[in-house]
């Protein structure tokens, strides 16, 4: 094996510097380095290209960061078990980004706390469900549970086609 270093004497002191051959091998190995994108698994040959590409994922990173903060907040605050959870159906795109399979739905998510009421509304249809966790729960997911559902249907009146209603939205205090 060749020694790619040589000694240089500078004012009575010896200094070891790499030779030109060693610099060439360092350049070759640095050009072979691959920088993967953590969101879409694309690979880039320079960190600058990866950085530019990651700007395209800014919305996804923000959504993932918000979801993590909300999850941490709920799990670190004991008083929240008395508050109802209002659920809306997340888009499949956001479920996939957050690490849930594309087939996931709201029902797949872990319950926050036993006996925690859950409200869900889809326009005229309102559901209140209270989950009672059993002994077979593992890791926050309920294997067996009893769900009490209070289901109400409300008549929603739509305005005539093409006619707008004028509503007074001012708040008089």
Curated annotation (Swiss-Prot):
The keyword Repressor applies. GO terms for molecular function: DNA-binding transcription factor activity; zinc ion binding. A zinc finger (C2H2-type) spans 35-57. It is found in: Nucleus. A motif (EAR-like (transcriptional repression)) lies at residues 167-171. Mostly expressed in leaves and flower buds, and, to a lower extent, in seedlings and shoot apex, but not in roots and floral primordia. GO terms for cellular component: nucleus. Residues 1-27 are annotated as: Disordered. Keywords: Developmental protein, Flowering, Metal-binding, Nucleus, Repressor, Transcription, Transcription regulation, Zinc, Zinc-finger. Gene3D superfamilies: Classic Zinc Finger (3.30.160.60). SUPFAM superfamilies: beta-beta-alpha zinc fingers (SSF57667). Its main location: nucleus. The keyword Nucleus applies. GO terms for biological process: flower development; negative regulation of abscisic acid-activated signaling pathway; negative regulation of flower development; negative regulation of long-day photoperiodism, flowering; regulation of circadian rhythm; regulation of DNA-templated transcription. InterPro entries: ZFP3-like, Znf_C2H2_sf, Znf_C2H2_type. Contains a slightly degenerated ERF-associated amphiphilic repression (EAR) motif, which may be involved in the activity of transcriptional repression. Acts as a transcriptional repressor. Prevents the photoperiodic and circadian clock-dependent transition to flowering in long days (LD) by repressing the expression of flowering time genes (e.g. FT, GI and CO) in the leaf vasculature, and by interfering with floral meristem identity genes at the apex (e.g. SOC1 and LFY). This is Protein LATE FLOWERING. It comes from Arabidopsis thaliana.
């Amino acid at each position: 094996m060749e020694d790619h270093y040589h000694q240089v004497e500078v004012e009575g002191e010896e200094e070891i510097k790499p030779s030109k051959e060693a610099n060439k091998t360092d350049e070759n190995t640095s050009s072979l380095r691959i920088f993967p994108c953590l969101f879409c698994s694309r690979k880039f040959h320079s960190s600058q290209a990866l950085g530019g590409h990651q700007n395209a994922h800014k919305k996804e990173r923000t959504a993932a960061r918000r979801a993590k903060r909300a999850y941490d907040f709920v799990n670190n605050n004991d008083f929240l078990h008395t508050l109802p959870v209002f659920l809306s159906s997340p888009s499949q795109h956001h479920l996939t980004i957050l690490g849930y399979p594309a087939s996931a739905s709201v029902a797949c998510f872990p319950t926050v706390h036993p006996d925690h009421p859950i409200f869900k509304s889809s326009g005229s249809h309102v559901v209140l469900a209270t989950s009672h966790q059993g002994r077979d729960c593992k890791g926050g997911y309920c294997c067996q549970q009893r769900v009490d559902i209070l289901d109400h249907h409300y008549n929603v009146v739509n305005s005539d086609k093409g006619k707008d209603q004028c509503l007074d939205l001012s708040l008089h205090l």
